[in-house]
């Protein structure tokens, strides 16, 4: 079953999302997925939609929202802040726990790229049952303040990203969230996945995340996969790794 849903975040803005629910049963383990920078709840070439349907067939509900300022949700892209993303994640998880399709004790937080960075940062706060990180984009933090200040020194406060207005204020806010220290404190099980052909997130970044989780992180690579897992093989492997991880924790 697929449902379109709307919720209000803590600032009163409407977030619009999609929920995929298995057909039989009442309360299911639920994956809350966070999309990447300039992305949306469907993902690159609908990869999140595909994975949500796959996991639904195996007994897992999936919750996917457009973050504030993205996709169909309220706001403009320039209104987005990293602090706001973290608040949205917490609000979405709290909403999910109240829904009759979700087991509130089995909420899994997932994210790709910037969404992975955000999910890792939010995890010590929201304490999900498990955490799944796909090529977490910690690299966007490094030099973020310097980039903003260099633009402002030239009198530029906003960039044009293929039609999306991106203000330097985002990077000033982002600077408050050093990726690895911000992720410390989560003690649950973690799945970390990277494609070996990812040119945006390197192996060292993933090993740094792996080191934070006290032996509870299962780091897997997909041979030849790029940052978006943009091949039929990569998608199938991604789905397989996620399902194996989930079933190792939760018996459906």
Regions found by a protein language model. Give the residues of each.
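Short beta-strand element of the alpha/beta-hydrolase
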Residues: 27-36
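The serine-hydrolase catalytic nucleophile loop
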Residues: 38-52, 67, 204
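The alpha/beta-hydrolase serine catalytic core
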Residues: 15, 126-221, 225-249
